[in-house]
């Protein structure tokens, strides 16, 4: 049996290199002459000469079908060889003509993925930093004329009073400073000289306070301060000034009564009035300090000075008022002293009761008015120490009225029974009352200084105002703290809707121009430039959205003075 002809194809090879004929004969015995005859009949060389071709291809060989040979053996007789379907000369020549036809070559299309090269910025990168003109002049020892030659960039202003301001690239300023001064060492020497000159200049200014104030006003480091005198004609300042005047007079007359009578209860009341007068003077100092305008060292202002002065006042009441009253009462119990006529003491206590009661009414009316304005109850307003100065006056005058009642009662018992121990017990009672007041003041003012949240209803209102904006998805980590003087600081993490922010940017763009820019993009570098341009503008739009929300919060809630919205 003759197996099939195995064919393989390759470009630009002859017919003889593509066709290979293997003949196998299964005859048990075959004469060499017969075998040679058969091989001469069907030879690869003669067949290849029959089909001359210089450009064969794989698909054409399927048309050539050869062969099969039947070898019959009868004993030792001769063999017959038969070749089936051997191609004729015309067929082979047709195949050769086909193979000579030029091949149709199609262009190869290879998809290559464009990858943007990653930039390595390192641990420190300042090439894109902006600085203001003032910083450029001060830090790099330049002049205004030097900055005129640099590229100017307009950016959004972080201050409420201006919309935008001019900045410069830090790299441009550094290059300009090196051009002016020649080397970093020369620049460092110049900065050192200017620093020394500035220190010397300030030392000269400190010798004259008037020149120093004019210098600060000229530089604009601080805004004009509020007149402290006007603070004491309204609100808590008015209450404090009334209390200082009345308690000062009461202290003077109580000391006269104590000197005249020698009563321990009267001594406690005199000490009580003295401590009240000193503490209220401290409150007045805190009020005058709290209205100062914020400066670079205290960016959130001095409103906490009211709480600080109230805290010190509470400590002073405990040490001076309660301590001396307990000491004098204990000494009266251990060493009783005879008491003179108490008539003048009763008169002074009566006058003190009237005056302290009047001051108490002034403080109560002020607190009620403020509590009503805040939408809070009187009790809650007092317990949370929303107005620390008036709170101190309220508690001190309440303690003063109760102290007068305690002292008058104990002195009356002493007058009736003639036992001075009742008078000493009255001194201990007044001291205990002052200790309770001081403990309450220390606790409430400490809580206020630690940072206290505003009312939950107010926090909810501020949060809903932000959540109702289309550009906001969600609000997280809300913190709203009371800074004192009716000022609130609001902080929140804001999850912005990127689609809304992007649409806000696109609404201000010329779509025809953008479409033309897109059509001009042909290379990855051009695509990068296009994306960076609009990406930076979208980031600026996001910053503008943050500024808009902050202004909206302050406009609808005047008590909110500081807003920090962080992008989540």
From Swiss-Prot:
- Where is this protein chiefly located? mitochondrion
Transit peptide from where to where?
1-67
Chain positions of motif LXXLL motif: 462-466
Keywords of the record: Antiport, Disease variant, Endoplasmic reticulum, Ion transport, Membrane, Mitochondrion, Nucleus, Transcription, Transcription regulation, Transit peptide, Transmembrane, Transmembrane helix, Transport, Zinc, Zinc transport
Q: How does it sit in the membrane?
A: Multi-pass membrane protein
Q: Which reaction does it catalyse?
A: Zn(2+)(in) + 2 H(+)(out) = Zn(2+)(out) + 2 H(+)(in)
Entry comment describing in which tissues the protein is expressed: Ubiquitously expressed in fetal and adult tissues and cancer cell lines.
Task: Write out the GO MF terms.
Answer: antiporter activity; chromatin binding; nuclear receptor binding; transcription coactivator activity; zinc ion transmembrane transporter activity
Q: Does the keyword Metal-binding apply?
A: no
Q: Name one GO cellular component term.
A: cytoskeleton
Q: Subcellular location, in the record's words?
A: Mitochondrion membrane; Nucleus; Endoplasmic reticulum
Q: Which Gene3D superfamilies match?
A: Cation efflux protein transmembrane domain (1.20.1510.10), XPA C-terminal domain (3.90.530.10)
**A GO BP annotation:** positive regulation of transcription by RNA polymerase II
Transmembrane segments annotated in the record for this chain: 239-259, 314-334, 342-362, 392-412, 424-444
Function description: Mitochondrial proton-coupled zinc ion antiporter mediating the export of zinc from the mitochondria and involved in zinc homeostasis, zinc mobilization as well as mitochondrial morphology and health. In nucleus, functions as a secondary coactivator for nuclear receptors by cooperating with p160 coactivators subtypes. Plays a role in transcriptional activation of Wnt-responsive genes.
Subunit structure of this chain's protein = Interacts with GRIP1, ESR1 and AR.
Which disease appears in this protein's record? Answer: Birk-Landau-Perez syndrome: An autosomal recessive syndrome characterized by early-childhood onset of different combinations of intellectual disability, muscle weakness, camptocormia, oculomotor apraxia, and nephropathy.
Hey, which family's this protein in?
A: Belongs to the cation diffusion facilitator (CDF) transporter (TC 2.A.4) family. SLC30A subfamily.
Put simply, this protein is called Proton-coupled zinc antiporter SLC30A9, mitochondrial
What's the gene?
SLC30A9
